[in-house]
């Protein structure tokens, strides 16, 4: 009987379904030390954070552990230093002085346990620092060592000791890597300029390149802020691409340029004489050239040229006509003056008469003004150049001022008051307005017609009317009114502060009019005691310093004071000699603090021109046509002799 395949046995009915529960997916890593049968209750994370209170013993243990770890780390660092840092006594590039001692006495150095501290010595130049570049350090040391021994000029100062092994290693490196040890021009300049005294090094290199000293071409400016139009520039380490375009770069800011280029181991070296359109100081020129040449400012020498040196002018002239220079613009006058024969012959002789004539024509009578103004004419006047080349400048200035004062004084004394006012009016070009003066007099309650009458007598020096006194309270414009009048008339000012001297009245000898400002009580007493004859306008003697007494007639005198002498009986003898005007009202000002009445010289010019007939200073019709007199000339003319 066949088997009942696929049928259920006895006691079973239907299908039996079985479902598997999968806890781990395919590819999931299962830890070997993890018990898969134990259920995760979360109790294994209970003691992960220790929240028990910290006791004193545990804190000491932690501090001890930290200290032990720090000591271990420090010891490890020291071991690394001993392992990888070389001895400073072995490498001649690290410590030259001690390496020299090792070479001199190697046996003594071998038994030395410790190095004795050495005293610090001052050196003229600092030894350039040998930096550690990390990779390829041996080649850098060998290259630096060989170039120092090969260059004739050492900027470090002092010998360089080396041991036998170091020399052999250097020679081996040079022979093996000769192609990789060539420095560019920029690198050579940077190494050389590590010296402390950069300027001295640049001056030496300049002399080697050009064959003359840089100081022969320049004059030194101590201040970097002093301005000048001409500058001599020497630049080192310029790239060749910049040198080709330098002429075009400076052309917009210059009127003249003289450029020379030389090539040496550093690169391109520039020597230029430049005249700028606007005067510049050294700082401005250095920034400008550093930008155009693409080099640091301390790689340049910048000074003004020596304009009074014939040798310097001849150098620029001779080099300018050669093919080694690039010259653009008009040659400076100081070069032309010293290189052309005619100019050289004209500068030899100084004539004092020409200097006096110039001072007279320009109204210079003070020594300081004459010296300063005449020295500035050296560029255009041959006699001024000869004056600067003279060793007697102070004597010439003193003589010129003395002669000019004599001529001016004689010219003034030759004129009467009418001619003098006309002469003073010609000094001012503007016409002005006479009305502010009249309005100011009305503001002070001064009758205009009586004022003109008394002013007329004062100008002509009428006896007993030769002195005008303006009195009144302070701040009424007394000094302003009188000072403006005296300034227009070219008068002098005397002060009672010098009354202790016998010569305080000496300025009256050479004056057309005079002013005595702010007369006090003691001054009125002095005038009442000693100056009655002077106030009368009569001749009197004046004591002069280092000279004999001078017999003069006192010029018209105007005084200001806060004291009214008419109200005091003791000054009754002065009242008949002094004409009084009272200014009772304060001087008016506008909101901006400006004077409401303009009492200037041009307004006084218009005042005297307008009222010339009332003041009896009008000119005749013949004089209106012009002055027929010849102008003063202290320079001898040339006599033309006919055959």
UniProtKB/Swiss-Prot annotation:
Gene3D superfamilies, per the entry: 3.40.1310.10, P-loop containing nucleotide triphosphate hydrolases, Zinc finger, large T-antigen D1 domain
Reaction catalysis annotation: Couples ATP hydrolysis with the unwinding of duplex DNA by translocating in the 3'-5' direction; ATP + H2O = ADP + phosphate + H(+)
Coarse class of the protein's main subcellular location: host cell
Key words, A-Z: ATP-binding, DNA replication, DNA-binding, Early protein, Helicase, Host nucleus, Hydrolase, Isomerase, Isopeptide bond, Nucleotide-binding, Phosphoprotein, Ubl conjugation
Motif interval(s): Nuclear export signal: 104-113
Presence of the UniProt keyword Nucleus in the record: no
Binding sites annotated in the UniProt record for ATP: 472-479
Domain SF3 helicase positions: 446-596
Glycyl lysine isopeptide (Lys-Gly) (interchain with G-Cter in SUMO) crosslink, residue number(s): 553
Enzyme kind, highest EC tier: isomerase
Post-translational modification Phosphoserine, affected residues: 87, 91, 105
GO cellular component assignments: host cell nucleus
Alphabetized GO MF terms: ATP binding; ATP hydrolysis activity; DNA binding; DNA helicase activity
EC numbers on record: 5.6.2.4
Segments for region (Disordered): 130-166
Motif Nuclear localization signal: positions: 81-83
Region (DNA-binding region): 181-347
Domain of life where this protein originates: Viruses
Post-translational modification: Phosphorylated.
Keyword Phosphoprotein: yes
Compartment annotation: Host nucleus
Family (UniProt): Belongs to the papillomaviridae E1 protein family.
Task performed by this protein: ATP-dependent DNA 3'-5' helicase required for initiation of viral DNA replication. It forms a complex with the viral E2 protein. The E1-E2 complex binds to the replication origin which contains binding sites for both proteins. During the initial step, a dimer of E1 interacts with a dimer of protein E2 leading to a complex that binds the viral origin of replication with high specificity. Then, a second dimer of E1 displaces the E2 dimer in an ATP-dependent manner to form the E1 tetramer.
Description of how the protein assembles with itself and partners: Can form hexamers. Interacts with E2 protein; this interaction increases E1 DNA binding specificity. Interacts with host DNA polymerase subunit POLA2. Interacts with host single stranded DNA-binding protein RPA1. Interacts with host TOP1; this interaction stimulates the enzymatic activity of TOP1.
Name of the protein in its database record: Replication protein E1
């Amino acid at each position: 009987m066949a088997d009942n395949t696929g049928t259920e046995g006895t006691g079973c009915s239907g299908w039996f379904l079985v479902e598997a529960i999968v806890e781990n997916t395919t590819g999931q890593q299962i830890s070997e030390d993890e018990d898969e049968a134990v259920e995760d209750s979360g109790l294994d994370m209970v003691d992960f954070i220790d929240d028990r209170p910290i006791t004193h013993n545990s804190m000491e243990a932690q501090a001890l552990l930290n200290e032990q770890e720090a000591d271990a780390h420090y010891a490890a660092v020291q071991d690394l230093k001993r392992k990888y840092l070389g001895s400073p006594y072995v490498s001649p590039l690290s410590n030259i002085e001690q390496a020299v001692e090792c070479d001199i006495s190697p046996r003594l150095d071998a038994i030395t346990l410790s190095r004795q501290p050495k005293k610090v010595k001052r050196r003229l130049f600092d030894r350039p620092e040998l930096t550690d570049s990390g990779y390829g350090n041996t080649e850098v040391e060998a290259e630096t060592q060989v170039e120092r021994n090969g260059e004739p000029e050492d900027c470090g100062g002092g010998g360089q000791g080396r041991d036998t092994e170091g020399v052999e290693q250097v020679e081996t490196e040079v022979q093996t890597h000769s192609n990789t040890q060539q420095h560019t021009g920029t690198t050579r300049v940077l190494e050389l300029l590590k010296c402390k005294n950069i300027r001295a090094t640049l001056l030496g290199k300049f002399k080697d390149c050009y064959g003359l000293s840089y100081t022969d071409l320049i004059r030194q400016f101590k201040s970097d802020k002093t301005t000048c139009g001409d500058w001599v520039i020497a630049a080192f380490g310029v790239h060749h691409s910049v040198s080709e375009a330098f002429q075009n770069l400076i052309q917009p800011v210059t009127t003249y340029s003289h450029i020379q280029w030389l090539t040496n181991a550093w690169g391109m070296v520039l020597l230029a004489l430049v005249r700028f359109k606007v005067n510049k100081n050294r700082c401005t020129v250095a920034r400008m050239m550093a930008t155009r040449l693409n080099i640091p400012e301390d790689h340049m020498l910048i000074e003004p040229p020596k304009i009074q040196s014939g040798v310097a002018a001849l150098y620029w002239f001779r080099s300018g006509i050669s093919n080694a220079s690039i010259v653009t613009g008009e040659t400076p006058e100081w070069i032309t003056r010293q290189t052309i024969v005619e100019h050289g012959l004209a500068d030899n002789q100084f004539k004092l008469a020409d200097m006096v004539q110039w001072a007279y024509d320009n109204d210079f009578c003070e020594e300081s003004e004459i010296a300063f103004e005449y020295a500035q004419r050296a560029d255009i006047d041959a006699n001024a150049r000869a004056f600067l080349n003279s060793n007697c400048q102070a004597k010439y200035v003193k003589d010129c001022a003395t002669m000019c004062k004599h001529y001016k004084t004689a010219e003034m004394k030759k004129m009467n008051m009418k001619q003098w006012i006309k002469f003073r009016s010609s000094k001012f070009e503007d016409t002005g307005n006479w009305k502010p003066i009249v309005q100011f007099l009305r503001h002070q309650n001064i009758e205009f017609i009586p004022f003109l009458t008394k002013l007329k007598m004062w100008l002509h020096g009428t006896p007993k009317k030769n002195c005008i006194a303006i009195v009144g309270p302070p701040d009424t414009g007394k000094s302003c009114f009188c000072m403006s009048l005296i300034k227009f008339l070219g008068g002098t000012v005397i002060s009672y502060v010098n009354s202790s001297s016998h010569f305080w009245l000496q300025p009256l000898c050479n004056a057309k009019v005079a002013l005595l400002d702010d007369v006090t009580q003691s001054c009125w007493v002095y005038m009442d005691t000693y100056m009655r004859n002077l106030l009368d306008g009569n001749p009197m003697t004046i004591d002069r310093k280092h000279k004999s007494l001078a017999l003069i007639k006192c010029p018209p005198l105007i005084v200001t004071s806060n004291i009214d002498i008419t109200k005091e009986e003791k000054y009754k003898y002065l009242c008949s000699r002094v004409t009084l005007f009272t200014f009772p009202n304060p001087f008016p000002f506008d909101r901006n603090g400006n004077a409401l009445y303009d009492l200037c010289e041009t307004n006084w010019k218009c005042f005297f021109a307008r009222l010339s007939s009332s003041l009896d200073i009008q000119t005749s019709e013949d004089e209106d046509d012009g002055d027929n007199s010849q102008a003063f000339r202290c320079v001898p003319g040339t006599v033309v002799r006919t055959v």
